[in-house]
Structures are given as C-alpha cells and as structure tokens.
C-alpha cells in the first residue's frame, strides 16, 4: 500500500534520524515529506522505528494511507522529487 509520511521534528539530530529511516524505505518528495510503498509488516516495523526516534511532546509525524487509485491520480507541479537530492 502507498503512504505519504510527513513530519515536523524540533531537534536537528532527531530530524536527521527520521529522514534517514524514511530514505531507507521511500522517496523524498519534499524536505519533510516521503512517499513509501509498504506492506503491513514493513509499515509496522517503520512505525516502531519512527516512534522510538521522535519526542511525542514536541514532534509531529503523520502517516497518510493512499489507495492505488488516489496514488496513481496524484500530480506533481514544479520540481520533480529527484531534484531534492541534487
């Protein structure tokens, strides 16, 4: 299943660890937004990993599931995702 994962992490070192964890499984489409294609097992593992990295009092992390129809109808305007890593 497809997911959009967005985060707002207060501390740089925590933000970098979250970003690294998400780069392992997804495509960075904005500086704090990733698209991931995950089966239920990998999603559960990722949620556990991310939960251990964030501070629940100061940080936010949202996981939005996307059905296939919605995912394939999505559009991008402006810079393509690959330009973020340049």
Name each model feature, range by range.
Residues 35-59:
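Short, intrinsically disordered low-complexity segments
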Residues 1-33, 37-42:
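Extended, hydrophobic alpha-helical segments
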């Amino acid at each position: 299943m497809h997911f959009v994962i967005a985060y707002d992490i207060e501390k740089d070192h925590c933000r970098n660890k979250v970003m690294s964890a998400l780069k392992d499984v997804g495509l960075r489409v904005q500086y704090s937004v990733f698209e991931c294609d995950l089966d239920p097992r990998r999603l559960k593992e990722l949620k556990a990993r991310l939960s251990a990295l964030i501070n629940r009092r100061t940080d936010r992390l949202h996981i939005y599931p996307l059905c296939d129809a919605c995912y394939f109808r999505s559009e991008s305007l402006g810079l393509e995702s690959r330009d973020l890593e340049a």
